[in-house]
Amino acid sequence: MSTLLHRRNTVRNVNELVASAPTISSQLTNDHRASLSARFRAVNTSTHRRLDAWMVEQAGKPYDPFHWTPQIARRVLGTSALRRINTRNDLSISQAVRDELADHLLRSTAGYTQSGSLSYWLSGLSHASLGLVCAEAVTWSTTTYEVLQGLEHPWQLAQSDAYYDVSAARTSLRGRRDIVIKNDDQRVVLRLRAGSPGKSSGPGLRCDLAIDALASPTGIAASRFIGVWPDAGVCLSVDGTMADLRAGARDLVRTAVVQQRGQMLKAA
């Protein structure tokens, strides 16, 4: 049975979701990992497969190859800017974003970048496009900062997203996570999204929960995984139960099946 909860995105509601998170979480064992690997191996692929919650929410629709856009870059730059502010309280959000942008451009000028990296992409933009990227990053930082300011429990910005390579299945999983809250024995993860949630946002949240647990060396799931849509004023949450972990894993495998069928039809 799913533990999906739907709430208005208010400071009080978010803090209540954090405080009421279960004290006991489920744990994924080596047997669970082996079972997931076998399921993915049964879905043949000619190339390395990369899956995340967004693909699950899009029902496995074909996607374009990755390329940087201001909307994608804003999360990386905006979060890095917030880390700067945590160490230097005298910085404003806009100044922190500009400093982060300048560091990337300096890295490219010094020749320390590779083709396809964020720094490489930024170095090829016009001044107008760089201004757009900066504005998007400031917006992301401001929105995230407002969420952080309302939290009543100790928090930290996630060091990275969760990544898990499925053994012998040519499949990589990526789970988004933005804020980690550790409260006694609880670990609550917050994921921020722009726009508004759709009908498949719950399954997407369960996928991020499952990938986060798979990426953990101990396999222990977060007590609660909270998705926040500040623009829409909505937040959803799922608990780290075995039922939700299995549901998230099943949805990832289903997405791989849908993608395989699409590739077969395209090749026919």
Pin down the residues of each PLM region.
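Non-catalytic protein-protein interaction segments used by genome-maintenance enzymes to assemble
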Residues: 161-208
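A non-catalytic, helix-rich entry segment at domain boundaries
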Residues: 80-160
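Charged, glycine-rich intrinsically disordered N-terminal tails and low-complexity linkers that flank
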Residues: 1-108
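Structural preference for long, well-ordered alpha-helical segments in enzyme cores
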Residues: 144, 208-212
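Metal-dependent nuclease catalytic regions and adjoining charged, substrate-binding loops involved
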Residues: 214-268
